[in-house]
Amino acid sequence: MLVSLSWLKDLVQVDDSVDDLAERLSMAGFEVENIDDLSARSQGVVVGHVLTRDKHPNADKLSVCTVDIGAKESVQIVCGAANVRAGIHVPVATVGAVLPAVDLTIKAGELRGVASNGMICSLSELGLTAESSGIAILEDTTKEIPAVGTPVAALFGLDDAVLELAITANRPDGLSMVGIAREVAALTNAELSLPLLNHTPEQEPLQAELDGSYYAVACVEGVQGGQESPPWIQQRLNRAGINAVNAVVDITNLVMLEQGQPLHAFDAEALESLTGKPVDAASFAVRPAKDQETFIGLDDQSLCLDPRVQVVTCHDRAIAIAGVMGSRDSAVSDSTTKIWLESAMFSPIRVRQSSRAVGLRTDASSRFEKGLPPEVTLACSQRAIELLSDQFACRVNGRWVGGEGPRTPVPLQLRRDALHQLLGPIDTDSGPVDLADHTIEQCLTALGCELESTDEGWAVMTPPSRRQDLHREVDLIEEVARLVGFDKFGSHLPDPVSPGSLTSRQQAERRLRRLFCSTGLQEITTLSLVGSSDGDARIAISNPLLAETSHLRTNLWEEHLQICVRNLKASMAGCSIFEVGNTYSGTPESVVQSGIISGVICGDRRLERWSTSGKYQAPNYYEARGVLSRVMEALHLELSDRPLADDARLHPGRAATLVMEGRPLGCFGQLHPALADDLSLPESTYLFELDLERLLDATTRTNRWTPIYKSFPTVPASERDLAVVVDRNSNAADLIQAIRKAGKPLLEHVELIDRFEGDQLGDQKVSQAFRLRYRSQNETLTDDKIQPVHDKVRAALSKQFKAELRS
């Protein structure tokens, strides 16, 4: 928000310097980001009187002028403007003056052999306009010419400063000059002199579909669209960063800046020409845009709308994007004599959706998005009509309003004890003292609140402009603290202070990350947003910034493989990575978020190769699978592998479903050779995916970590190997489970140590060898005690799997 200090002083009688005022506003929550001192544009520029004008002897387009600047002697200035002549008053930049608008310092010198001691300025050289066709002639801009030698700052309104304020979302009143003036008055106890908002005449009901909006129109005849607005209006708009257009549009913009209520003027004749029908108040409506409905805005940009956008219509023809921008075809032009003046309160949510959908953010939309008080909607329309009446001999042919208007406000209860408890005492020379009642009342009254005393405190009726922000008791307490000064209150912390802590699931997730890192894998983070895919049911987001980030990802492994490709192309020996992240499935109306741990083991993971004579040694299936085994052993979780042949990503003979506690936890396997070849990845590339939620559930069960004492064995163990021939589709995990069950209570450990396939066994047979370790806690086992248990194991395998014993 750009705030002109001169305009602000017209609204509130404040005498503070611009620096003091900026500090007060910043301390009160309106951060001043920049101060533009306009007087710097005209320092050293004074009123001059051209006494003579002669042709330059050495240049056809230059003139030699004698100019009186109020000094003892007149000065000679060489000027190149075609409109310079004797007898006029002009702004003259004297020697030493600096003109920031054109980055020029005036020096005495010569032009084509003739001395020149100054420069006659144009409006653009003073930073007042973007372009100028000649020098500024004061007789054309003002009726009363100041004395020669007078600084021109006041003459051109440059005795001003513009403050750039950062307005937070909870203070929409700060987007108006009246709102800032009220704030300054509350901070400085200065007197307000706001423009009077007259009560509006009777409004006729507007019988139209308004899509939840509060909508008012007025028919005004007798305007002149081609007429410029007065200089004071143009100056105020210029200070606020808005270009002047014509008197009608400028007045609507002025009311928006002054009161915070955006207005819009439609050309009545243009509407009739556009729709081909007579236009009355009932012709207007508000509705969602139709799919693929076209719209050309005031910026001449053609837009294709959809139902997310709310539009204002005339005879069902879209003439404005509600709260954002009007249409080019209904805009006020030089031939406009009759307008329909719109003043409305559109839903902040709908305006925000419309603005995002079309990619437009305007001065109007920024105000509607933050919320407007409906109490001033009609009053601002009347304010604009009064300004139009001052400019033109116009008349109003009717006013109409429809939709849900202002509601009866409910006073807020402010308890004295609650305020003192939350803020505490203020620090004074005599010690800490609670705020006095009259100080509290003075602060709230300065904000425009109406107070009524109660037994516990006050019943507070907030002003309409602050009801978007002040709707709870604590909001009123904050305002009191802000106006008194936060630095005036003593610092105190709640007692006792509760330290923060991690939940058991958060601790478990952090431990998982550490364990994977300890195995040599590097943790990465990838974007949750990806591009579209024909073969993947990805969920599209509503307003993507880029086509590459337009959908929610359904997996992590695709991006992980691309990361491996990039790293190997960068001459990395290998790439072993993992990520803890979310994937998304379902429909746009019902999105399902799933947490997983996904990773890739690719290439050489070792940093040195001295043990392999400098040669690359690819990890085999069991080495890669051992990474997961080490993590699960640290978590005291047991995984078993089940054959997996229907995953298109993985090698059909080298993939497994990982089972924990009888339920699938995820998968592990070698990348399918065809996919590895397409991506130019090594054949020994392995993928894994684990269900994060199930892992966290398993590691955070309350009965899981109960300490159980188990003494170290003091007697030796006895190991025996057992090789069996079984069907090719027999799972080693099933055999191990059967061995453990049959080997109780002496069997301490069993592991697969060999797997053999050969022609001598047959196509459908395979040999699997296991190493069994027997031990007793109390005595050294002899063969007499081991052999019966070992025979029991062999018998169980023969019976359950039709196993042929090889040893």
Swiss-Prot record:
CC terms in the record's Gene Ontology section: phenylalanine-tRNA ligase complex
Organism: Synechococcus sp. (strain CC9902)
Encoding gene (name): pheT
Keywords: Aminoacyl-tRNA synthetase, ATP-binding, Cytoplasm, Ligase, Magnesium, Metal-binding, Nucleotide-binding, Protein biosynthesis, RNA-binding, tRNA-binding
Subcellular localization, as worded in the UniProt entry: Cytoplasm
Every B5 domain range: 407-491
Family affiliation: Belongs to the phenylalanyl-tRNA synthetase beta subunit family. Type 1 subfamily.
HAMAP family: Phe_tRNA_synth_beta1
Name of the featured protein: Phenylalanine--tRNA ligase beta subunit
Cofactor note: Binds 2 magnesium ions per tetramer.
Swiss-Prot/TrEMBL GO biological process terms: phenylalanyl-tRNA aminoacylation
Chief location of this protein within or outside the cell: cytoplasm
Disulfide cysteine pairs (residue numbers): none
